From Swiss-Prot:
Binding site for substrate: 66-67, 88, 193
Reactions catalysed according to its record: N-acetyl-L-glutamate + ATP = N-acetyl-L-glutamyl 5-phosphate + ADP
Origin species: Methanosphaera stadtmanae (strain ATCC 43021 / DSM 3091 / JCM 11832 / MCB-3)
Record-listed E.C. numbers: 2.7.2.8
GO CC terms, sorted: cytoplasm
Pathway this chain belongs to: Amino-acid biosynthesis; L-arginine biosynthesis; N(2)-acetyl-L-ornithine from L-glutamate: step 2/4
Site (Transition state stabilizer): 31, 256
Full protein name: Acetylglutamate kinase
Gene Ontology BP, a term: arginine biosynthetic process via ornithine
Family: Belongs to the acetylglutamate kinase family. ArgB subfamily.
Length: 298
């Protein structure tokens, strides 16, 4: 006799079928961040979701962050992390630690997790094959915690000039999942620290990704940060710009939202902000009618 659980599984598979067909052979950019980077269960769930996307015919691409781990490593080495207005100041010594943590630790851990769940992946950084060419930001206007606007030099912090997508295309065409550390390279061969959200959005646009998925520690875009029920399910880019202008979207959510806006306005079909703390959030967003996060479209 077939039990209810088996019926439920069949219903889930049938609901997923239209989306599997629609996104077959499409590139899906996933930005690993927040809880999905530090909690063992969340990391495992995210890796399984990513591998499943590959096995049902999609082409997942991963970009990861690593801010908290960088700060922890700096503390262990006796170097105090320095932030101005929430932005990391990256001197030469800090840059060496950033490279060590992003490429040598986090990237390899993600590749190992994907491999454990049956995924073929290759770890690279934005420096490889000049994937992400960048230049130093130089003097940057930063709003200090006391409200004062300062012009500061953040050191080896870069802005993206161009993305050369050939390496990513070569990997996805050969059935690998690229796992990308958010580093860039300048004209003099210097390594630059880049914002991981921005890297994910820029590469997603360049490779004509169907979706950009940003994993965070919030359910989605909230009109009231203290009320999960205020989450917006679907929103257009012009409406999002108004929410930023009106001060409804603030703080660390602004760069994530701006990344989604830029990606969608530059060729990505939809962008999604999801709660990486929720098991299988990627699958629930892609393969169900209503999803579980916020979807951004033009």
């Amino acid at each position: 006799m077939v039990d209810q659980e088996q019926f439920d599984i069949s219903n889930v598979l049938i609901e997923a079928l239209p989306y599997i067909k629609k996104f077959h052979n499409k590139k899906i950019m996933i930005k690993y961040g927040g809880h999905a980077m530090i909690d063992e269960n969340a990391m495992s769930s995210t890796a399984r979701d990513t591998v499943l996307l590959k096995y049902v015919g999609m082409q997942p691409i991963v970009v990861h962050g690593g801010g908290p781990e960088i700060s922890r490593s700096m503390d262990k080495m006796g170097k105090e992390p320095k932030f101005i207005g929430g932005l990391r100041v990256t001197d030469k010594e800090t840059m060496e630690i950033v490279k060590m943590v992003l490429v040598g630790k986090i990237n390899t851990e993600i590749v190992s997790k994907l491999g454990f769940h049956g995924g073929k992946s290759v770890g690279i950084s934005g420096k490889d094959s000049y994937l992400v060419e960048a230049s130093r930001k130089g003097l940057t206007k930063v709003k200090h915690e006391n409200g004062e606007v300062l012009e500061v030099d953040l050191g080896y912090v870069g802005k993206i000039d161009r993305v050369n997508k050939q390496l990513v295309d070569d990997l996805t065409n050969n059935n690998y999942i690229p796992v990308i550390s958010p580093l860039g390279i300048d004209d003099d061969g210097n390594t630059l620290n880049l914002n991981a959200d921005t890297v994910a959005g820029s590469i997603a646009s360049e490779v004509n990704a169907e979706k950009l998925i940003v994993l965070t520690d919030v359910p989605g875009i909230l009109t009231d940060p203290d009320d999960p029920e205020s989450m917006i399910r679907r929103i257009r880019t012009d409406e999002l710009k108004e929410l930023i202008k009106d001060g409804i979207i603030t703080g660390g959510m602004i760069p994530k939202v701006e990344t989604c806006i830029n990606a969608v306005e530059n060729g990505v079909k939809t962008a999604h902000i999801l709660d990486g703390r929720l098991n299988h959030s990627i699958l629930l967003e892609i393969f169900t009618k209503h999803g579980i996060g916020t979807m951004v479209r033009e």
